[in-house]
Amino acid sequence: ALGATPADTDELLVSDAGTLKRVDFSHLKGGGMDLLNVTTLGADASEIIVDNVFTSSHDIYRFFLYNMKTSANADIHFQLRYGGASGTNEGSNAYVTRNHYAYNSGDGQQQNSHNDGYALLNGWTDLDANTDYGTSVEMTLFDPVDTEKYTTLMAHGTMYSGDGSYNEVVNTMMGWFTSKARSQTGFRLHPSAGNFKQYTKLLTYGMKLS
């Protein structure tokens, strides 16, 4: 039995009407998404960094961030990174963001931000550190390696508010684009205060074109 997924150039034997033929594994794979990275925190951490994950092999990336808790009431910041391993954060004046979010009381808010050093995943309200509710966020990032246009991202999530006015479940939707046309290679997540708690989990997928 195979101990791992074959490489694209590995050859497999296939029977064609009784005749054995060698076929590259790349011709047998279906379309869909490739799992590129799994991050599970074994201890509290001040940030999550994933480098060398964006390449020309995929145009669209999906992220699933869940079981996320913070040690202090905090915003969650998302930054792109460039330069490969030990890359550089895409920082000052790089992001334009629009957030919409609603509380279970029925109240809703929206927020716009321009020329920030990060994209804000949770709108105006902080995540509540003193809760059993784990935050879950799903994000889609489009073509981060294209140097001819700005990178765009859409996200939506469910969290528990640490805002004293709204201590309740919050649903958020956001979209942003960078104001820097640059080939991005990775990304960083970090809370504005405290740490990510142990067991926070992040899955990163790349979507294939065929």
What are these regions (language model features)?
Residues 1, 5-20, 24-210:
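Surface-exposed molecular-recognition determinants
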